[in-house]
Amino acid sequence: QELIVTDIVAAFAEHPLRPAYRGPIAPAPRQGAAAWLELAGGEVTIGAPADGFAFDNEHPRHRVLLAPYALSTRLVTWAELDAFVDAGGYATPSWWLSDGLDWVRAHHVDAPGYARRDGGRWLVFGPGGEREVGGDEPVLFLSYYEADAIARFLGARLPTEAEWEHAARGPLAGRHGVAWEWTSSAYAPYPGYRAGAGALGEYNGKFMVNQLVLRGGSIATPPGHVRPSYRNFWPPDTRFQLSGLRLARDLEVR
C-alpha cells in the first residue's frame, strides 16, 4: 500500500506536467514547540515479543546497553530546514559525511526530494500535486545523508534504532507515525538472528548490508506496521519515501 503511493508520486514527479492522481491532501499535523524527552538509558530490551505478528528481522528480542540520552518531542520542521539552507547547509562540508557530500555534489542536491524553494516559501510535490509547506510541519523526503547533516547543523544527532525503540515503548509512545524517522543504525541482523529456509528467508536476510534503519511509520503506513519494533530500511541516498528525522542528544552520566 505505502510503496504503491510513493511509487506513483515518484513516477508523476518525473512527468513534465506533474499530474495529481487525487485531490489535495491535508497538511501534516502541526507539531508545536519542541521539547526534550530525557531517558536514563541502562540495560533495555528491544525487538518484537515472541507472541503476535512480526517480521523475522524484528527477532530475536535482546538486551542493549544505552547511555543516558534525550529525544525531541517532534520531528525537524520546514522552518528548521529554512535555517539550514540559509546558512549554506547544502554547500558546507563540515556538516556532511564524506559520502553524503560526494552525493550532494554529484547530483546537485539543494533541497529535499520533490521540494523546491520559491522565494520565501517551500513547495513540495505529492499525491495531490504541488502544495505549499512550512512552519512547524515536519520535513519529508529526506535522505539519510541530509538527515545526518541537518542534525549536525542543529547541534544534535540521529538516534540509534535501540534508543528510538526504547523511547517508543515509553515517553515517545503515540508521538510517531507521521514520517519514517532515520536512525544512525546500519541495517544488520540482531544477535542470534537466523534467516528462514527458502525464499521466505531471503526477504530480509539478503538485504542486511549498505542500508540504514528507519523507524516509526508514516501517514501512508498500514496501521499494523506502526509498532515500536518495526524496522524499515533503505540505502542512505533514498528520498522517495516519506522520511524525516527526530533529533537526539547525549546526556551526562550521573
What are these regions (language model features)?
Residues 18-22, 58-62, 78, 86-109, ...:
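Surface-exposed recognition segments
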Residues 44, 156, 173, 178-181:
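Conserved active-site beta-strand-loop modules that form the wall/rim of enzyme catalytic pockets
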Residues 49, 54-59, 95, 102-129:
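Active-site-adjacent "lid"/gating segments
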